[in-house]
């Protein structure tokens, strides 16, 4: 069911920084559980390749001591063959594990996007009122992509790093304890530097993703409203607004990159310090004939292996931080409270269309009431018009009837049942609606018309189109009913889009019909034809009509007049005119008529 127009109330889901990266990481890794066997296979490949990698420095040291120092070059081919085989196997295993992890990460991304999209179908409408649409799109697309970029590489590097570190430490202590302790002396400094830098960069990467969502929101809004922007020559103002947010993104992005960019050179400095210590102590031990030159070469190799995982982590650091920030933003949506039916909610069966509002109060922000003590009763089959100036509460009444929002106080009943005791899907499927702002989808004309009644036949579709006088222009489209519409039917005129929306409501054939400014975008001739067909359509249906042009609702069974969220008058057209009240003022202000009391 399409949504009635709503009022935005500013963004939600804004937090100053990433709260708990450990919990976020743990939850993100939970998406890998279905792939446990695949991960075990990858970890076996990683373990074997890491062990082979750990052996290479030892073999290089042995080659120096066995081949080059005693000048036994006849043994060189044997050692070269062994080293070459190790390097070849290591490369093959790295390729295999990378290929598997990239496939696995794509599956995780698929599941995340699927869960996000399904969640967005179940959250209350108020969430979309308060959250910029571009920010939501950014979470579904950009934030999930950030996670994909990290999962494909970082998990392998993390596990490979652990195995390599463990293997390197074991081999170093087997070769020489003193040089092993010298190599490990740089670890506390490495951990300290990483902790200091990470605590600063985490908040900037979260802020970077939040501002990126704002920028996406501006782009999405400007593209959809480009005609209005050009009409009012607001291009410069829109560019200024874009520049402000873009500048904020530049600043926060620069800070994030600067802070994260500090880590690699600092780690490089620590690594060089480790090499210097090994070379210095190793040279001193070699002069005393405690170790050989090959042992020094072995330790330099192990030192590189020991620091390589730390270096890789620092190089991936900004991606990891961004992925954690993105995961936090994704989980914020996944943790939103969903629209839930009452445990005892019932299905509407054999809908009669009786509607009753009892002392209904409502406010969007829980502060200023939009509706105040609204009470009225609509009998089955009645045609009721809601009339009032902009902001009087007409659309809000429809929002509440559709249960896009729940009342603060009072009751709304359909067929004598409180709508909070009716399943939302059952309630909404009983109501057909024509929006003021027509919503069409990027599919064929026929599929758009069938949206409220997927089982409609081609004959039923054409009959409904003839009733609404839309058949004549549909037949002249390039592919007729099979013509694929562009974004929201922008290749059609506003009147044509309105006619398609009316036809869609015809096909749905609900017991309750809501017409929100149904003919406000149609020319006078077409409007008269539609009005005749529409009154015929409304026979036997409970119909609620919202219209500012009061001449379209003269024949309504009941007119409810609203002002500032309150009902000020109710009655038929002639009765209200004779009262010379607020409705009389509205009517005469539109048509310049002075109607004498009889």
UniProtKB/Swiss-Prot annotation:
ATP binds at residues 388-395. SUPFAM superfamilies: ABC transporter transmembrane region, P-loop containing nucleoside triphosphate hydrolases. Its main location: membrane. Residues 39-322 form the ABC transmembrane type-1 domain. SMART domains: AAA. Residues 355-589 form the ABC transporter domain. Keywords: ATP-binding, Cell membrane, Membrane, Nucleotide-binding, Transmembrane, Transmembrane helix, Transport. The lineage of its organism: Bacteria, Thermotogati, Thermotogota, Thermotogae, Thermotogales. CDD domains: ABC_6TM_Tm288_like, ABCC_Glucan_exporter_like. It comes from Thermotoga maritima (strain ATCC 43589 / DSM 3109 / JCM 10099 / NBRC 100826 / MSB8). This is Uncharacterized ABC transporter ATP-binding protein TM_0288. Belongs to the ABC transporter superfamily. The keyword Cell division does not apply. InterPro entries: AAA+_ATPase, ABC1_TM_dom, ABC1_TM_sf, ABC_transporter-like_ATP-bd, P-loop_NTPase, Type_1_exporter. The chain crosses the membrane at residues 40-60, 80-100, 150-170, 177-197, 273-293. Pfam families: ABC_membrane, ABC_tran. GO terms for molecular function: ABC-type transporter activity; ATP binding; ATP hydrolysis activity; ATPase-coupled transmembrane transporter activity. It is a multi-pass membrane protein. GO terms for cellular component: plasma membrane. It is found in: Cell membrane. One of its GO terms (biological process) is transmembrane transport.
């Amino acid at each position: 069911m399409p949504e009635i127009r709503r009022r935005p109330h500013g963004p939600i889901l804004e937090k100053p920084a990433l709260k708990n990266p450990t919990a976020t990481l743990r939850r993100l890794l939970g998406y890998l559980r279905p792939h446990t066997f695949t991960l075990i296979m990858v970890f076996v490949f990683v373990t074997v390749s890491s062990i082979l990698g750990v052996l290479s420095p030892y073999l290089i040291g042995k080659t120096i001591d066995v081949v080059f120092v005693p000048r036994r070059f006849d043994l060189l081919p044997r050692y070269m063959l062994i080293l070459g085989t190790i390097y070849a196997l290591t490369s093959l295993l790295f390729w295999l594990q990378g290929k598997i992890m990239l496939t696995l990460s794509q599956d995780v991304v698929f599941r995340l996007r699927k869960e996000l999209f399904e969640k967005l179908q179940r959250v209350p409408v108020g969430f979309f009122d308060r959250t910029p649409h571009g920010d939501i799109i950014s979470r579904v697309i950009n934030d999930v992509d950030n996670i994909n970029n990290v999962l494909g590489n970082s998990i392998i590097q993390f596990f490979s790093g652990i195995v390599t570190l463990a293997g390197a430490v074991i081999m170093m202590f087997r070769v020489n304890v003193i040089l092993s302790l010298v190599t490990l002396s740089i670890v506390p400094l490495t951990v300290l530097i990483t902790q200091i830098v990470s605590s600063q960069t985490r908040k900037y990467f979260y802020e970077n993703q939040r501002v990126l969502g704002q920028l996406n929101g501006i782009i999405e809004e400007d593209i959809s409203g480009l005609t209005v922007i050009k009409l009012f020559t607001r291009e410069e103002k829109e560019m200024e607004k874009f520049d402000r947010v873009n500048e904020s993104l530049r600043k926060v992005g620069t800070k994030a990159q600067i802070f994260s960019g500090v880590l690699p050179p600092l780690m490089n400095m620590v690594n060089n310090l480790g090499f210097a210590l090994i070379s210095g102590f190793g040279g001193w031990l070699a002069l005393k004939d405690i170790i050989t030159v090959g042992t020094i070469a072995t330790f330099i190799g192990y030192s590189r292996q020991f620091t390589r995982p730390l270096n890789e982590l620092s190089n991936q650091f900004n991606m990891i931080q961004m992925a954690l920030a993105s995961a936090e933003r994704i989980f914020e949506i996944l943790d939103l409270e969903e629209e839930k039916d009452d445990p005892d909610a019932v299905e509407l069966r054999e809908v009669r269309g009786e509607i009753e509002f009892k002392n209904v109060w409502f406010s969007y922000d829980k502060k200023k009431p939009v509706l105040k003590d609204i009470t009225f009763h609509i009998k089955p089959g009645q045609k009721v018009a809601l009339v009032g100036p902009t902001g009087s509460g007409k659309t809000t009444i429809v929002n509440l009837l559709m249960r896009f929002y729940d009342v603060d106080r009072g009751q709304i009943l359909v067929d004598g049942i409180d709508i909070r005791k009716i399943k939302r899907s059952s309630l909404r499927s009983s109501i057909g609606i024509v929006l003021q702002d027509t919503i069409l989808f990027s599919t064929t004309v026929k599929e758009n018309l069938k949206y409220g009644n997927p089982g409609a036949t081609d004959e039923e579709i054409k009959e409904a189109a003839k009733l609404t006088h839309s058949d004549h222009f549909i037949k002249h489209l390039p592919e007729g009913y099979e013509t694929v519409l562009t974004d929201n039917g922008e290749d059609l005129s506003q009147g044509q889009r309105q006619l398609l929306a009316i036809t869609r409501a015809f096909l749905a054939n609900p017991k309750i019909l809501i017409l929100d400014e149904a003919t406000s975008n149609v020319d006078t001739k077409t409007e008269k034809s539609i009005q005749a067909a529409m009154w015929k359509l409304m026979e036997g249906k409970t119909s609620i009509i919202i219209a500012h042009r009061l001449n379209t609702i003269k024949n309504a069974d009941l007119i409810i007049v609203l002002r500032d969220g309150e009902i000020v008058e109710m009655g038929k057209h002639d009765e209200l005119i004779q009262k010379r009240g607020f409705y009389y003022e509205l009517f005469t202000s539109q048509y310049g008529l002075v109607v004498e009391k009889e």
